[in-house]
Amino acid sequence: MIRLEKAGREDLAALVQLQEMVRARLLPEGQPLPETAGDSLEDFFAHGVVLRALMEDDTMVGAVGGREVDGRQHLAQLLVHPQWQGQYVETMLLLQMESLLPEARRELLFPARDAADLRPLLWLGDTVSEETPLPHGLALYRLEKSSI
């Protein structure tokens, strides 16, 4: 059973470790995950909220950061442990974030290898509004969802 709760700054080391696992799955050694200005975990702790997904033994298997920007919900740093990807952890995190930041519009930046990685987001009603090619066969997708 997975439970969701707000993360605190004391979780930063575990979040960075989770971020590294996701990065290692997507990119060659030493290459950072793409992020835009203001989208670091520290930024979300300072100006928004970070949710974490925990197993019964308190192992962190997922996280997402969100905040309100110009009247819309802005999400980034959607991180799910590689062994738990595609098992609805992403969906649970996004649905919970919707309840915490109930805005009429959501924007999510999401790095992925291909559009198949976007399935959980598309299932929730997000649409791809922009796709930016990145090195190493990745793309940064900007997804939006109206009427949350």
Regions found by a protein language model. Give the residues of each.
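Conserved GNAT acetyl-CoA-binding A-motif
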Residues: 101-113
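Conserved acetyl-CoA-binding loop-helix of GNAT-fold acetyltransferases
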Residues: 80, 86-99, 123
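Active-site rim helix/loop that mediates acceptor-substrate recognition in acyltransferases
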Residues: 28-51
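Conserved active-site alpha-helix within GNAT-family acetyltransferase domains
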Residues: 113-131, 135-136
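Conserved beta-strand in the GNAT
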Residues: 59-67, 72-79
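Conserved beta-hairpin
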Residues: 48-64
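Helix-loop element at the rim of GNAT/NAT acetyltransferase active sites that forms part
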Residues: 17-32
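A short beta-loop-alpha structural element at the N-terminal edge
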Residues: 2-17
